């Protein structure tokens, strides 16, 4: 009977699969799509900025002003992502995980309409403001989707479903690259449609996701609605007997009673969550500061130096995006076999090696004729390495190493680090590139090395373990006797009254 229950636990039901698809396609896909959507049509959009300025002022826009406006267009997205991350805790605690995703569609559908009409309205300000809104959408979804799916999934499918959001981010990037081909929508007339299409997945999610269950953990632990939690589990698992899983959630609820809701400020003060928090910051910072955006930024120049014609670079870039999708799809299937820790070590080590070899290849490309081809290989190897570990695993890891009361605040911190790091790399890499030239990637190699060492020394394997079991592993690292021991309750009570109320 016990064996039968274990087999049941791992079943991917139609309801669970569809809920995963709707959450990831309606939210994570848009993150990836909006990362890449403005790249291909940038020439036509900047011409629109100039034409609009000319119509208003009867003179062409100055080069500096145009560069500033375009920089704002690009940078508003990660800035919005940072704002969205700060909203996560409030939304998921008050609206639930599913409710937060449904609310988040406002920040997709509204800017999609605005961007689609921006050319007719003759307003580049609409585009800049809309980029801020879709950034907020991405900031919320990049945190809430992994949280939602991690709480829906049985523990033996938690890794695979936890990687799905990153898979849909890569699919979104690839679709934007394909739609952004000059023969498709990267044209003077097509770019508003390209930008406006981001609202389609949001509309689908808004229509269909309400018919799928809320997180059972949220319903039981935070809403104290045991019957609703049991019904949600029965719907997700496809059978009536969910007593074992309900008992697991009750144990988690019992373990957390001493803590209550843990705010961001409390999280920074709690000894029992210290190494979980440090690991979150290191992994999220390492994910972005390892140079993934810089690699994509530099890729076009690498392809051109290897002899790829300027008109063909867009196809090679799309090919790189396809490799990213394929490797992330592979990760979905191997994460439960190889484990999270191993994939992180493999991924960061691969990125480290690629950055070192790429530095050598770029330094010697004018001396040795075949070095540009080595550079192309390094870009592809780096993309593969990042797709295997650094891209998909950190968000999944946050879901697994925190319990219900601290998870929203942990995602707020992790998401903020993610988007700030993203913004910093985008802001300073062009200057680093000018100053260091081909040696720019040494900085990213050092970050990959330090992150790899940290993972090897500190990060445990979480595969196949319950949330409480994982926190018991960290309890030893944090030098506390249990997940939430009595002295931790005293620690919380010793905080200043104003802090406890946050």
From Swiss-Prot:
It comes from the Eukaryota. Induction: Up-regulated in jejunum by a diet with a high fructose content (at protein level). Up-regulated in kidney by a diet with a high fructose content (at protein level). Up-regulated in jejunum by a diet with a high fructose content. Residues 1-17, 91-97, 149-160, 213-276, 334-341, 394-411, 460-502 are cytoplasmic. SUPFAM superfamilies: MFS general substrate transporter (SSF103473). Residues 39-67, 119-125, 182-191, 298-312, 363-370, 433-438 are extracellular. Glycans are attached at residue 50. The chain crosses the membrane at residues 18-38, 68-90, 98-118, 126-148, 161-181, 192-212, 277-297, 313-333, 342-362, 371-393, 412-432, 439-459. CDD domains: MFS_GLUT_Class2 (cd17432). The modification N-acetylmethionine is found at residue 1. Keywords: Acetylation, Cell membrane, Glycoprotein, Membrane, Sugar transport, Transmembrane, Transmembrane helix, Transport. Detected in jejunum. Detected in kidney, skeletal muscle, brain and adipose tissue (at protein level). Detected in small intestine and in kidney, and at much lower levels in brain. Detected in enterocytes in duodenum, jejunum, and ileum. One of its GO terms (biological process) is fructose import across plasma membrane. GO terms for cellular component: apical plasma membrane; plasma membrane; sarcolemma. It is a multi-pass membrane protein. Fructose uptake is inhibited by mercury ions. Fructose uptake is only slightly inhibited by cytochalasin B. InterPro entries: Fru_transpt_5, GLUT, MFS_dom, MFS_sugar_transport-like, MFS_trans_sf, Sugar/inositol_transpt, Sugar_transporter_CS. It is found in: Apical cell membrane; Cell membrane; Cell membrane, Sarcolemma. One of its GO terms (molecular function) is D-glucose transmembrane transporter activity. It catalyses: D-fructose(out) = D-fructose(in). D-fructose binds at residues 31, 166, 287, 295-297, 386, 418-419. Pfam families: Sugar_tr. Belongs to the major facilitator superfamily. Sugar transporter (TC 2.A.1.1) family. Glucose transporter subfamily. Functions as a fructose transporter that has only low activity with other monosaccharides. Can mediate the uptake of deoxyglucose, but with low efficiency. Essential for fructose uptake in the small intestine. Plays a role in the regulation of salt uptake and blood pressure in response to dietary fructose. Required for the development of high blood pressure in response to high dietary fructose intake. PANTHER family: SOLUTE CARRIER FAMILY 2, SOLUTE CARRIER FAMILY 2, FACILITATED GLUCOSE TRANSPORTER MEMBER 5. NCBIfam families: SP (TIGR00879). This is Solute carrier family 2, facilitated glucose transporter member 5. It comes from Rattus norvegicus (Rat). The gene is Slc2a5.
């Amino acid at each position: 009977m016990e064996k039968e229950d274990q087999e049941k636990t791992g079943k991917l039901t139609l309801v669970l699969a569809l809920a995963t698809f709707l959450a990831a396609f309606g939210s994570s896909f848009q993150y990836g799509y909006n990362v890449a959507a403005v790249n291909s049509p940038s020439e036509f959009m900047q011409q629109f900025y100039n034409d609009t300025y000319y119509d208003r002022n009867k003179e062409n826009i100055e080069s500096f002003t145009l560069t500033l406006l375009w920089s704002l267009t690009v940078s508003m997205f990660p800035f919005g992502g940072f704002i969205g991350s700060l909203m996560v805790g409030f939304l998921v605690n008050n609206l639930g995980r599913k409710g937060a995703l449904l609310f988040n569609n406002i920040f997709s559908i509204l800017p999609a309409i605005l961007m689609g009409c921006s050319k007719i309205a003759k307003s580049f300000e609409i585009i800049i403001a809309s980029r801020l809104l879709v950034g907020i959408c991405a900031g919320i979804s990049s945190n809430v989707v992994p949280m939602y799916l991690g709480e829906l999934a049985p523990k033996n499918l938690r890794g695979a479903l936890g990687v799905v959001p990153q898979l849909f981010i890569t699919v979104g990037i690839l679709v934007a690259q394909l739609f952004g081909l000059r023969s498709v929508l990267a044209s003077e007339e097509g770019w508003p449609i390209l930008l406006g299409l981001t609202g389609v997945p949001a509309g689908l999610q808004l229509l269909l996701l309400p018919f799928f269950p809320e997180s059972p953990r949220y319903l039981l632990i935070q809403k104290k609605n045991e019957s609703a939690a049991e019904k949600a589990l029965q719907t997700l698992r496809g059978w009536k007997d969910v007593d074992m899983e309900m008992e697991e959630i009750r144990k988690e609820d019992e373990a957390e009673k001493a803590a209550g809701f843990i705010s961001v400020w409390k999280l920074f003060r709690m000894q029992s969550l210290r190494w979980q928090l440090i690991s979150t910051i290191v992994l999220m910072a390492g994910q972005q500061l390892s140079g993934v955006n810089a690699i994509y930024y530099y890729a076009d120049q690498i392809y051109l130096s290897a002899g790829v014609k300027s008109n063909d670079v867009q196809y090679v870039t799309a090919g790189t995006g396809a490799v990213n999708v394929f490797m992330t799809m592979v990760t979905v299937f191997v994460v439960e076999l190889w484990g999270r820790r191993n994939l992180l070590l493999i991924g960061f080590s691969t990125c480290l090696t690629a950055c070192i070899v790429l530095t050598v290849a770029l330094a010697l490309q004018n001396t040795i004729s075949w070095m540009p081809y080595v550079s192309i290989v390094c870009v592809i190897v780096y993309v593969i390495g990042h797709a295997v570990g650094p891209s998909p695993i950190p968000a999944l890891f946050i879901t697994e190493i925190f319990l219900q009361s601290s998870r929203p605040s942990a995602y707020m911190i992790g998401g903020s680090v993610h988007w700030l790091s993203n913004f910093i790399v985008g802001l300073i890499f062009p200057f680093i590139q000018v100053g260091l030239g081909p040696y720019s990637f040494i900085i990213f190699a050092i970050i990959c090395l330090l992150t790899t060492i940290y993972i090897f020394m500190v990060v445990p394997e979480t595969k196949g373990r319950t949330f409480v079991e994982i926190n018991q592993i960290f309890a030893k690292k944090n030098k506390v006797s249990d997940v939430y021991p009595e002295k931790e309750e005293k620690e919380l009570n010793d905080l200043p009254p104003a802090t406890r109320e946050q």
